[in-house]
Amino acid sequence: MSSKQLNIGLFGFGCVGFGLYEVLSRTPTLKASIKRICVKDKNKSRPIDSSHFVYDREAILGDEDINLVVELIDDADAAFEIVTEAMRRGKAVVSANKKMIAEHFAELLVLQRKYKVPFLYEAASCASIPIIRNLEEYYDNDLLERIEGIVNGSTNFILTKTFSENLSYPEALRQAQQLGYAESNPILDTGGFDAKYKLVILLAHAFGLVVPPEEIVNIGIDRLGALEIRYAREKELKIKLVATAYKTDEDKVAAFVMPKFVNHQSKLYTVDDVFNGVITKTCFADQQFFAGRGAGAHPTASAVLSD
């Protein structure tokens, strides 16, 4: 695909969609351009001319000149319909929809093999951190024993404010909502569901396991109380929402998402604000640490662009 012009059909023009548009506009040397953008709301004010937009998905899916579909919408069910139909029509697909991918992983892999088209989703795991590519390429010949990390920027922002500025949990959450890091109904983030969907994706690339999301335990930061926060402050610890997967002594894999006390020795201790951080442990290379922005238009768009 890299040797020919990529004609992109983009679904969604929110934060990340606009970020991708800007990034592509600033890199004219790339052999890629957005031909059409499909959105739902005709009346919504947008920062570029309305001639770029279409409102029927068939305008993209039925266009034979479009050879790459980029899916960046919130609706997981609609995203699955778009992605599967694009693959059936022989179009390459890039997606950032971690919920859709986690819930339909097995089906999507079957479709990818059947129609022999690229299906890439680096942005669905840790935004700007190229963790999937490293798991697939760098660790291909090493034995991965453990992977854990902060993979949700919204909750990390809330926890950072709680400890660095001594804000209460409700105050920190309200600030995250005001800045657009958390939704008005933030349970997907604060309940650990977003992190769980990302862990499902990491499990597939770290250990070759395709696991339904409901099989992974997730406990979110919404379960934290004043006692845990006070204890962490007294002991000079931080609390981080950590997604963890590791091989057990019985050669099985344990996986879960939950808040964790971290001390100064942990690499995750320094991962604050909306940043993500991932630690891998392998048989030969031992520990390695990756960090990068886990939220925002341009960081996430950079991962979409790399795909």
Each language-model region and where it sits:
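Substrate-binding/catalytic subdomain of NAD(P)-dependent oxidoreductase enzymes
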Residues: L173-T270, F275
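C-terminal, non-catalytic macromolecule-binding modules
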Residues: Q287-D307
